[in-house]
Every structure is written in C-alpha cells, then in structure tokens.
Amino acid sequence: MAAEGGRCQKSYFDVLGICCPSEVPLVEKLLQPLEGVQKVTVIVPSRTVIVVHDVDAISQSQIVKALNQARLEASVRAYGNGSEKITNKWPSPYVLLCGLLLVVSLFEHFWHPLKWFALVAAAAGLPPIVLRSIAAIRRLTLDVNILMLIAVAGAIALKDYSEAGFIVFLFTTAEWLETRASHKATAGMSALMSMAPQKAILAETGEVVAARDVKVNTVIAVKAGEVIPIDGVVVDGRSEVDESTLTGESFPVSKQPDSQVWAGTLNIDGYIAVRTTAMADNSAVAKMARLVEEAQNSRSSTQRLIDTCAKYYTPAVVVMAGSVAAIPAIAKAHNLKHWFQLALVLLVSACPCALVLSTPIATFCALLRAARTGLLIKGGDVLESLASIKVAAFDKTGTITRGEFSVEEFQPVGERVSLQQLLYWVSSVESRSSHPMASVLVDYAQSKSVEPKSENVSEFQIYPGEGIYGEIDGAGIYIGNKRILSRASCETVPDMKDMKGVTIGYVACNNELIGVFTLSDACRTGSAEAIKELRSLGIKSVMLTGDSSAAATYAQNQLGNILAEVHAELLPEDKVRIVGELKEKDGPTLMVGDGMNDAPALAKADVGVSMGVSGSAVAMETSHVALMSNDIRRIPKAVRLARRTHRTIIVNIIFSVITKLAIVGLAFAGHPLIWAAVLADVGTCLLVIMYSMLLLREKDSRKAKKCAASHHGSPKKCCSSSHHGSHAKKNHGVSHHCSDGPCKSMVSCKESSVAKNACHDHHHEHNHHEEPAHKHSSNQHGCHDHSHGHSNCKEPSNQLITNKHACHDGHNHCADTSNLHDTKKHDCHGHEHSTCKEELNALPPTNDHACHGHEHSHCEEPVALHSTGEHACHEHEHEHIHCDEPIGSHCADKHACHDHEQVHEHHCCDEQQTPHTADLHPCHDHDHDNLEVEEVKDCHAEPPHHHNHCCHEPHDQVKNDTHPVQEHSISIEESSDHHEHHHNEEHKAEDCGHHPKPKDCAPPPTDCISRNCCSNTSKGKDICSSLHRDHHTSQASRCCRSYVKCSRPSRSCCSHSIVKLPEIVVE
C-alpha cells in the first residue's frame, strides 16, 4: 500500500530476516544512507519496514535489493489485492540440508567418519548467518547473528562439531518457526490495512478507476457483495451493510438515502450509489490503519526500561564471556575446554531477544485484537495506562445518551417574533453547526414547512460550552444554554427549573430573549451495563456534562443511580479541572467524550476515549483510544484487554529471565551445554511469541463452547448463567424445573414419583425436548417450548407432595408466594409484557386457581374446582385478554385444550356446570376465515354468544380396573407438513368461561382441526366412528386422544410464535 504526498511515497516491506530488536539498527543503517529515503520505520513484531521515499530517486525494488544484500529476505507488501499469502511455508534449503546432514552425523558411533557430517551441516546452514553478521560488522552493530557466529566458531575450535551443527540448526529452525508463528499477526495487520478495495466504479459511466484517484463529491456505484471503497453518503438505493470490520458490530446496518457509509464495509444486498465525502487516503479505514501503524511505534514505559537494560546487557555479557575465556588461559588453569565452553554459553546468552520481544509482541497482538473489535488504541503506553485505570469520567450527550434529540417544545417569547420567523432563524444558524442538537432543530423546522438557508448566515461562531452565534437578515442570533444569555447581554432569564429530564435551549437577539425550546434525549442501550462492568473491575464512574442539572439528574435516574458522582453545567475548562482533581484524588483517570467541548478533558486524562466515527475530528485526534462504534460497552472490554496484556507481558519477562538464569546457572554448576543455551535463547523467543498471540483469541467464544459442551453431560444445570435462560428453584422435591438457555442441547428433566416436572426450553433455536415417562396417578407433566424467552420464576417452598405449581414466564417475572393445599394446582403462564396476579387467600382448600396472562394482559381468575388430577396444554399467540372467569364444577379429572393461534379476539366464555354432569362437549374446529362453530350432536346446545370446548364424562368413567395407574408417555416428532398434539382424554375436558362482549369472540381457524374423543363412553365411541368417516382414518387408533392437526408450518406455544409444536401422546 502506498500513500502519496507530492513526490513521496510510503512503501511497506516484509522483512522476514528481522528476528529481534537488535537488528533494527542494521536495517536503519542499510537504508538511511540511500538517496531519496526520507524516513525508515521498523516494526519488529510484524517484521515490517515502512519507508517514506522519493519515487523518482529510488524505487521499491532498489530498497528490496539493499535489504537482501544483508540476507534479510525482504519483499514488497501489496495491500488490497487479496494476494497476501503465507511466505516461508517450508524451511529454507539451508535449514533442510543442515538438518539432514546433522541426522546422518548422529550415526558416528557405527562409523566414526560420519562425525564430519556435523561440520558439513554447520557449514551448510551458516551462509545466512555469515552474510547478516558481515553486514552488521560493516555498520558497527552487535546483533544475535554475530553472537551465534562466534558460538559456532568456538565450538568448531573446541572440535565439538556436533555442538556446532546443533547451534546452527536450532538457530535457523527457530527463526523459521518464529516467522511462521508471527505470520498470523502479520496477516491480521495486512487484512486491516487492505479492508478498503483499491478500485472504484463510477456511477455515471460504469468506468473502473483507482480509488485514490476518486475526488470528493464523486458518485460511485456499489453493488451487492462488494466492499465500499471510499467514505460517503448514500444518494440512491437501499441496502444492508456489514460494518463489523470497522466498528465490530455483528449486525448489519440498514442504509438508505442520506445514510453515511464507510470504506471497508461490505454491501450485503442491494445496489447503492454513494457520493464520496473524503479522499481514499483520508477515509475512516485509512485513518484507522495509520493509527494502528503509529501505535506500534509507541513504546510503553516497561518497553523503554527493557530496551535500556538490553542496551547495556549485551555488551556486559560479552565482556564477561571474554573474561571467563581469557583469565583461565592467562592463569594457565586446568581444563581450559570447560572454561571455553562456559564462555560460549555466556556469549550465546548475551542476546536478550526473548526479553526485548516480551513487550512489543504482546502489545502488537493486543492492538490488533482491539482494532478487530472496533477499538483503536494509540500505542503500548496507552495500553499500559488503560490497565491501571481507577476512575472513568463520561460526558453525557452523545456518550451516555444517544445524542438523538427530539424537540419537546419550541415557542417564541413575547410577541416580537413569530414562530415561523424564529424557526427560520434558528434552523438557518444551526445548519452551520455539527452539534447533535443542530440537525434535530433543522429537521423540526423542516417538519413545520420552514426551509433553512445557511447561505444567508454570516459571522458564524462557536462558543464551547455555551452555544453558537450567527447573523441572518441583519439580526445577531445567539442559540445555546443559559450561559449564552450572559454573552447576549440578556437581562431577564425565565425560571425553567421545574422542567425535569429535558435540555433547555434559549434564543436571544439584540439583548433580548426571543425564544425557548426543550429537547429530550435517552440513554444508550448498554450504558448502564458498561458502567456496572467498570464497577465490577474496581473503576469508579462519574458524569461530566455541560447540560443542565435537571437533564443530568434525569440521566442518572435512567441509569439506576449507578454513577458515583454527577457534575453538571460545566464549561470545557471545568471538565479539565475536575479530571485533574480525580487524577489526584483517585488515581489514573479515563475520560470518554465525543465532541469538541471534550477535547481538552480528553487530553488531560491519562486515557482519553473518543466516540470515533460518530465523534468530532478534534476529539478523535486528541484522544488516546477511539471507539469506531457508539457502543460504550467496549470500554470495559478495552480495560480487560489491557489488564490481560499487562499480565502477558509480566509472564513473558519472567519466563525470559528465568530461562537465561537457568542456563547460566547450569553452566557454572559444571554443565556448560552450548546447544541448550541456543535452544533456550531461540526457543524462549518462540514461546514468547506464541503465548502473546493468545491475545488474538476471543475469550467469549471459548466460554460459549465450554458452556455448550458441559450441558450435554449435565442436564440439570441447563445454562443457568446465560442471558436468555431462566431461574428455577426446587421445592422440597416436589417441583423440579429445568431451564435451558441458548444452548443447543437436548435436556431431559427427571422427577420423583410424587413430583411435578416442568421443562422450559428458552432458546433461540427450534429445539424440542424429550422427556421420559413418569408413572403416578397424581403426577402432572407439562412441557412448554418457549422461543426467545426470559424467565424468572419464584416458587413457594411450602408445598405438599401432591401440589402442582408451574411458572412459565416469557419476558416477564411471575411470582407466586401463596401456600397451596395438597389438592391445589396453580398454573401461571405469564407471557410477553404481561402481569399475572394471583389472589388465593379467599379460596377454599380445594380450589384450583389458573391465571393465564398474555401479551399486554392483566388477568385475575378465581377458579373453584374439585379435582384430583389435571392436564393443561395452553397454546396462545398474540392474545389480548382481560377477563375474570368464575368457574365452578365437580370433576374428578380435568383436561383443557386451548389452541389459539394468531387470534386477536377474546375467547372468554362462561358456563356453569352442574355437579357430576355426564354431558359431552367436544372441542370445535377453529377457522380465521370461516367463522363457524361446529358442534357434535351429543353436546348440549349453548347460547349463541358462548363458545364452549368441553368434553365431560361421569366421575365413575375415569377409573379403569385394567389401568389403576396412568402411564404418561411423551414423544416428540417433527414433520414438515404438520405437528400433532395429543393428550389423554380419560380425564374430563372443559374450557368454560364468559366474555362480556360476545362479538369479540372469534372462532379459531379451520385448518387446525381439533378433536376431543372420549371413547370410554358410548358417545365417545360414536365420535370415534365419525372420525373414520371424516378423512381422519389415520387417527382412528388414537380415538381417545386429543390431537391437533395443523397445515401451517409454524405454530405457537404460550404466545411464542414460530415454535414447532411437539406431538404429545398421553396413554
């Protein structure tokens, strides 16, 4: 990638021969003397050399040639063409030959002359080391190549040829491994730099041109599946754009005319025409690439300390090694070979590659990881400061709040100016401003048929922390907060303190207040969550805003009063003063802002965070961290990343030092192993690189995989910690709830013989739950499949063993604290945005209370029943119910089957049943289109305004001598055509209610055919026979089961749509 500025060009080179910072001086001394080279930057972690040069004086190929003369394996990096590929996939021929010969030399015990192959192996791998050493010596620099060359020469002098061969092989192999290990980081940087394509298509002619040649205000065409090459505004078309590469947002963003689009983002579907607003080199992605590039050269205090130590460490160890070899020789000590070997071990250990790499490689990986998630951290020093933050100060407008204002009130003061004239003046002056309030006022004026004319405004001026000024039609207009009135010399200011939660603006002209307006703003989604996360990290959060105290207090209340301090009505200098006080009182301070007013405070803070793309250019340039999106939840993620990076650097430093000390200690203890010293040196470098690259991995994905895997083997836990899960409590062995969060596991809920089992599946998939059969006459089994459900169920702990209590809550909190008798059952099915209240204190001991709250419903239903067993399956979707249903009947068992799908009507009917009735009321067919109610002739006639779906049989028919204990078996089947829902009909079925307005009762659809068959009676057998005749032959064997056959592909269960209903067979 090349950035041109006049006759200069910035070129990028991959230099694989750079293995540690000790070779940086060599590269600089090779290139800086060349004519036309203006600046040389070496980035060791990514093995990149950036050269600013005159293209007429020296070309890229000449620079590559100069680097390769020192065997640095340089090549030109080409961004944007997608051709970046893995280089050095295999070791060089020198390394392969060296290794092969070294293996042959290992068989010298079988044939002694084979030992010479080790010497040949050393000679075969030396050429790259020798050439680099010569280049370093010519420029009077001491690097690792010279140290390794001396170590090889010393081993050969001691006639330890195998040692010499191992030194060369280990060093060259480790260099290749380091290159391969760091390729991922280099590839990540290449992808970041080449996000924007190098070509663009002109919308008018269809001509393909270079992106860098496209001028501002040129309309370019972007088709579906293409990457937007230049920043701009959509002028035609609509589409969804994936901005994850730039902002880290995972969801596509809808774009329509007047929407801003950014270079490097992907147009998913649809054609759009974009008018460019910047040159390719000044696009957001280009700025991001430059910031990351500059950040790599910004050293932290830890890195500067290590570099300083390394500067003196290498010469000191070289002198020590020379002394260890020279002094015994001069003193004519015995066993000189041992002292020479010890000197060589010290010499190899003189290169602090791993120690010097410990900080920059970790910093590089952290900066790249942050950039991938929409965080631009400008250097290792910022990352280090971010890890020690104790206080976070937030601006309000556009940071904590959305910055998307709405005009609540706009009115003139007095009779001097009309509303239309006032709107014209305000909108015209505000059209010159970039403040978030400005566009809202302009839009409001246009909605009142007032067109602003910014060209008529002169002498426009911004007063930070106060407002703006402009002259139009000979009148000087001041617009801003209360302070602007002092500047406008207004004598009277109205008292507006009683207006809570709004931002108050004033309009003044000629020393007189002529207008007042109020704007409201809401907190961003995730603001409270971000502040809570910071608090969990031990970071105090405060608000600094120039807005009114009322607006600041309102925002604090919206956040749940989680801010430690709130400072309102501040000027920019006040924010700077408070940030300084926070630094002195609490420690390192972080400041988050998005506007020009925040720039001084951002610069004053230890770490300033701007809102990036949406923020002002001044704030982005002044800040130390830029958010490429408006999600401030990335701030605690940045703090976590910084702290994790700090820990990684500490581990790298400790490991680097310990390995050096261990090798030297081993040598002084009488075991001077040169090959071990080489392995410790280059091997430690490799391990430091690999450990640092763990920062590139995403921790959340590993946790999610771990959670998903654990739930396959542990059905009882069921993702209790997930955001979409539910909380359930076990009540004395009576009720066990299994709540499955967003895991794709199939969970079975088990219970004791006297317990009730409720299995709730809350997920974002179409999952099905299979549950084993449970045998007991008093058991109740309910299986509810909820999609996108959030549940919080609280159940009483003082239930008896036959109590049945289920709390099913979708997007709701349903609580029951009543004391239940052992024959009571309480079902609370709370659905989306519903409130369910139960009052059971007035009920007799045998009462059964059922409350089904649906979407936007408030339901209170006292129910009195004599029942010992009950099966309830309720399917409600998009219901709006407000009903009170007193029901009284004497039943031994009860079965109610309600199938309501997409019916926005009321089905509340009332029927008073006499005790021990033997009448049969089968379920009726429901149809959206044909609003008819079909009744079987065996059922009693009901009034026209009642819709009853009841199936009753005498009490003595329930008991069966051959089946004293009921067996409940539940199976789940899925069909592309239909879903069948079966229930046991050996119980009485009843749905009796009353609705005050019969006209609101609408029959359900006909395509869902529902039958309740009770074949234990003669009437039930007649119904079975009728099923044979009514094209339901396949279901004749299931006559005594209640089933639903629906032709629709999607069903509902408990007001949750698009949930595939299981087939439930109760036998």
Swiss-Prot record:
Composition bias (Basic residues) maps to 724-735
Which Gene3D superfamilies has this protein been placed in?
3.30.70.100, Calcium-transporting ATPase, cytoplasmic domain N (3.40.1110.10), Calcium-transporting ATPase, cytoplasmic transduction domain A (2.70.150.10), HAD superfamily/HAD-like (3.40.50.1000)
Q: Which UniProt keywords apply?
A: ATP-binding, Cadmium, Cell membrane, Ion transport, Membrane, Metal-binding, Nucleotide-binding, Translocase, Transmembrane, Transmembrane helix, Transport, Zinc
Q: What is its EC number?
A: 7.2.2.12, 7.2.2.21
Can you tell me where the transmembrane regions are? Answer: 94-114, 117-137, 140-160, 162-182, 313-333, 342-362, 649-669, 673-693
Among its keywords, does the record have Iron?
no
Function per UniProt: Zinc/cadmium transporter that plays an essential role in promoting translocation of zinc and cadmium from roots to shoots. May control cadmium loading into xylem. In roots, transports zinc and cadmium from the apoplast to the symplast to facilitate translocation via the phloem. In nodes, functions to load zinc and cadmium to the phloem for the preferential distribution to the upper nodes and panicles.
- What protein name is recorded for this chain? Cadmium/zinc-transporting ATPase HMA2
Organism of provenance: Oryza sativa subsp. japonica
